[in-house]
Amino acid sequence: VDWYPWGEEALQKALQEDKPILVSIGYAACHWCHVMERESFEDEATARVMNEHFINIKIDREERPDLDHIYMDALQAMTGAGGWPLNVFLTPDKRPFYGGTYFPPVKAYNRPSWKEVLLALSQAFKERRNDIEEQAATLTSHLSQSNQFGTQSESLVHIPREELFTRAQCDTIYQNILSQADKVWGGFGRAPKFPGTFSIQYLLRYHHSFDAPDALKQALLSLDKMIQGGIYDQLGGGFARYSTDEQWLAPHFEKMLYDNALLIDVLSEAYQLTRNEIYSQTITDTLAFIEREMMHTAGGFYSALDADSEGVEGKFYTWSYEEVQLVLGDKAPLFCECYDVTEHGNWEETNILWLRHPVKEFAAMKKIDAAALEQLLAGCRQQLMETRAPRIRPGLDDKILLGWNALMIHACCKAYAALGNEHYLTLATRAMEFCWQHLRQPENGQGFYHTWKNGQAKYPAFLDDCAFLIRALIALQEVSGNLDWLTRARELTEFVTEQFSDESGTYFYYTQLGQKDVIVRKKEIYDGAVPSGNAVMAANLRYLALVYDQRQWASRAQDMLARLSQTVVRYPTSFGVWAGELLQMVKGTHEIAVVGKDYLTRMRQVHDYYVPFKVLLGNEKDCPGLPLLEQREQAEKTLIYLCQDYHCIKPVNYIQEIVNLLK
């Protein structure tokens, strides 16, 4: 196929030749994208039809998420479904009129063949152009209107916070999440099952706020079952994108940077709350995997590992019964029973390693010592890991995306806060410095690029890139005590409010001002696989408003949430980050300031406790311009100040005194 990148050359050619545009959107770790490439795009006869009748454009959805959002929204409006590969047909002026996902090379699965679709659309474009233009106009109008979904139009900024956000709303969110929860296998909804990290995090925080044991039970069940499942790489660490079954046995084997970052976030909170070493070990092993397989030598993080190797999904990760016997010898029977390895296989005639029962439970069933069993299993896992290492590896998508890197930086900060391992702070700092060095736009003040690869950065950053980066800068200050990160967060927030704000000054567009190659500026408010940029910006504005006493930022954050609150309460699994914001609005934020020569030690001690809703600042001396750190200094003392809602209590010397006050 004569593929073009999305750009001026292809778009002008479509206008000059008056040809429809075929846009195929996929991503490197997408199994069905590879299948369609192999079956259709690499077939000469099919390629001839595509080249003759269409201007063909291929887009990596991770490089251009703005275009993916627009055309996926159009596909869902047309068909009620979505997914990748996303194949969408446009008029020469970029407006969508038809689309679909995977099409087979011959008619099958109740789908027409790809060639049939191409020829029918080419004929329709020539013979029924008016119908096509009408459909394109309708869809484009829908795309503009979809920005309004779920939001109330009038500003609610004048209503007191305690009237807008209530305990009753938090309770309803909890009940709505629980109504979708799988009480046996954890997680939410039916297969395919995604991790649901935002809902798990809400349950942890709801329990911490209101002492709700059932919320904690469901959150921990979800984490435990994923950690025991095939969705988690039992040998090498790291989580796959989702499970194809309700038991978390058979994953779709691609490993994404963002999933692992978000799971490290929530595992860190679970560890702070429970001190369960299974969570600390999973964090340790997952970050070891990230560092070993998904990190550039200069410190940035790669995007994804493919599901396939040698053209077979999961081949790198699965085992035959005979292989395990050969490697482990007399230890094999016990290992195979524990990890469900059988002669006939537990998935497509091969075996995915997973724990049907937790190790301690299995030890009790077998009447053997749990510590001795864990030691034996650890040795077995190491032997199998060494045996697996020379296999042909899944493909690596080595793009370095600003937003996903920011998610992993945030995760490293959370892991450092929870476990105290200095190496995680080093990883976070190096990755942030990588972003600052390689993804900044020197010609655009505070601007950034979206993606970097092989020394080249491209595409202006999108809202979620900037929102996640601000959040990561805030987290980095909280664990390092370096206030420079906070200054950068404030400057980037000012840039975002200038470049991304909508006309009402409430929400933010996904793209910056002046981007000419999109047919509509979308506003993304759902929390999908990654958080909504708007939800994270609301949290950033609320945090920085407290730090810098910026009342207008606090008002905007409140208004963003208030206009959405009814929708958030009804659909919390689609608005999980917003739901967490609502809970924080109800509970309030602890503002903790530490001033004195031992401030870093005291800040470190704060992280030993689970305090999910906090602002934490520290410095050796007073800091003019930061109200929480003004007029706090006392000679030879390190003092800890606790404030909430513009009211502070008497400073204390020791962290235990603060912990008692927080309780």
Question: Model-found features: residue ranges?
Answer:
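Long, polar/charge-rich, low-hydrophobicity segments
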Residues: R292-M295, E443-A467, I474-P624
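Replace the tail clause
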Residues: V1-A411, A415-A418, D517, L561-K663
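Glycine-rich, acidic and aromatic/proline-enriched surface loops and short helix-turn segments
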Residues: K225-Y232, R430-Q441
